[in-house]
Amino acid sequence: MMVSFNINSIKEYFPNLEINKIQVNNEGWDHEVVIVNNNLVFRFPKTEHIRDKMVVEECLLKNLKRIITQISLPNYKVIKNDKGVPVFGSYKYLNGKPISSIKYKETLKSDTNAKAIADFLSALHSLDYYPLKKLGLDCTYNREYWMELYNKIEGTLFKYLTQWQKEDIRYLFDNFFNNNLYTHYKSGVIHGDLTDSNILIEKSKVTGIIDFTDTQIFDPAFDFAGFYWDLGPEFTEKILKFYHGKENIDNLYYRVKHFYGIQPIFHEMLHHLEHVENFNIQDFMEKYNNYRCM
């Protein structure tokens, strides 16, 4: 029903658009995505909270596109109703496929890709965020967010874990909450969800970055978490060699290695517990154990 409603909305706001082919992706947490004619992408927010973020995303991308040329970004436009309320967002389809769809990723870990990613992050993290704050950009990943995550882990996952694993996770979070390196940093605009699903590749070259829904003002180290977890520490270090940030790289990498680059596993396990039957939690913990021993 919602798919039909959204397609009707596209027809209402784009009456001259001839629709020959439609692809729908409803798997994301934030948007239903409709791709028309392999050419136009329409993103419909699933909640009011996500709807409120659309104008910030539009403004951010407009500013970023002025200074980033190596990597393609969505030419994002928010479509509003006659009362000025955002209905959906649209942009021209970007070529490439997400890294997550590629089985063998070693060819992606080139100096060229590392530099392209580093240049993108250097530009993003150096943006003046005060104009975006006026539009509503804030910090979601605050202390309360991480406390809530830990409580969920303790209440939901601990019963499946060994005593050593539980103690190590407690130590991981205790260090995060009490180590000054996690509070004394220079905040910047971050992407907030820079995983292998949101980085586009074509012919083994990074060509685009999408989905800025989780953009916020936070620790720039967080944006390296996906690379660390999905593509490994070595490639993350390679990116950092080309990165120009506001602080000491060793301090930033410490935060990636000892918390941000590890925490994606908890979201994965919680998601699987809720949505996947008969999965082995120790299969996930094997990778966790390996990363913690590095």
What are these regions (language model features)?
Residues 18-19, 36-40, 69, 203-204, ...:
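Short glycine/proline-enriched coil/turn segments at helix->beta-strand junctions
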Residues 32-35, 42, 171-222:
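Active-site acidic catalytic loop and adjacent metal/ATP-binding pocket
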Residues 3-7, 58, 237-240:
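Short, surface-exposed alpha-helical segments at coil->helix boundaries
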Residues 43-45, 77-78, 189-192, 209-210, ...:
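Short beta-strand segments
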Residues 3-17, 109, 114-115, 126-192, ...:
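An alpha-helical support segment within catalytic cores of ATP-dependent transferases
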Residues 29, 115-116, 214, 225-294:
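Helix-rich C-terminal or lid/interface subdomains of diverse kinases
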Residues 21-144, 184:
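ATP-binding pocket architecture of kinase catalytic cores
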Residues 66-70, 164, 246-249:
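Short helix-capping segments at alpha-helix termini
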